[in-house]
Amino acid sequence: MGLIDFVKEAGEKLFGRGEAQAKMAEVKSDPDNAAKIAAANGAAGDAILDYVKSQNLSATGLTITFDGAASTVTVYGVAPDQATREKIVLCCGNVTGVAQVKDMMSVDQSEPEAQYYTVVSGDTLSKISKQYYGDPNKYMKIFEANKPMLSNPDRIYPGQKLRIPPA
């Protein structure tokens, strides 16, 4: 899949909690300290990995790294299918502070790739469904394709990137 762009200011706020927050505070106090930068990047990568796992998504050899200077996540591993791969990538990218995800994953079972859509103000899943499928009533297909990251079809936010499965 390569490099996927995300809205850096939108998404889950993972870096403001726990160890990731403490490491980021250390870097801000001494931005020239390479060890502190590496520790902060490691803590951020671990926070994203924990978030992916909290969504009950897994892949063989799943590894997530974060480069704070470039606001880029790199994800490695072998997903069981294309949908899981895409959901893991979305979990990595729909995080405040992440501008890009470098997808280095592969899949056990090859399937057609979904399209991606970035939510803008005023969007609903019905509106997006009408745009992609010509039928606003197919919004549940988009909702199901983005579970477990979406828990309610009415809870999407500007800047969020969604999977749009093939029609």
Q: Locations of the language-model features?
A:
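Secretory N-termini
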Residues: 1-107, 155
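A generic helix-loop boundary/linker signal
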Residues: 38, 119, 132, 149-150
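Primarily a LysM-type cell-wall glycan-binding module
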Residues: 67-74, 79, 108-136, 140
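Extracellular LysM carbohydrate-binding repeats and other cell-envelope/extracellular binding modules
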Residues: 91, 95-112, 140-167
